[in-house]
Amino acid sequence: MADDLVKFGDEATWDLICSGRSIGIFQAESPLVQSWLRRIKPRNIWEMSAVVAAVRPGVLASGYADQYVINKDDPDNIPSYGNDIIDDIFKSTNGTLLYQETLMALGSRLAWPHLEENKRLVQVDKLRKAVGKKNQQKIMEVGREFVEGCTKNGVDKELSDKLFELIKNCGRYAFNLSHAAKYARIGYETAYFKCHYPLEFFTVYL
C-alpha cells in the first residue's frame, strides 16, 4: 500500500528529514540520529542508508562517520589510494568504510581474487566473522591472511596493513548495506506520511 501512496524523491519529505524533526520516523527518533540527519542532509535513499550506518558504534568510534560528512561536503577531500580497485570500492561511501559489504569487497577483490569462487567466498566470510567478534587471535590470524593475499596481488604491505586496520576498527559494528537500505526506505515512507498526511500519521503514532 505504501508504494501506491508514497512519491519517492519528494523534496518536502527530504526537507523534513534533513531538518532532524524526525519524531515518529522509523529508526530516526533518537537525538543521535536527529543530529546525524542534520549533518549528512540526505537527499536520496543511499544517503539515508549512510545515516543508518553512521550511528553504529564502530563507525562512530572509528571516526568514519565524521569523515563521511567531511568528504560528502567536499569531494576533493576523498583520498586516493593510488589503486583503482581500492578507489572504486570506496567510491560509493565517500572514501569511508560504512558497511560490511565494503570490507567484504576489499577481501574479494584485493586479497583473494586469485582463489576459486567457493574458496574466495569462504575466505571473505571468515574475514567478516573474525572482525565481528572479540577474539583477537582470530582477528590477527585473518589479518595476516588478508595482508598476505593483498601483497600477493600487487598491493604493497604498508597499504595492505592500513586497509586491514580500517577493517578491524569498525568491522565489529559495521552495518549490512541491504539492511541499512531497507531501514532507510521505511524511514522515508514514514517521513512522507508525516509530511503529507499529518492527521492520519499522528493519529496512528499516538
Model segments located where?
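Noncatalytic, beta-rich nucleic-acid-contacting surfaces in large DNA/RNA-processing enzymes
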Residues: M1-L206
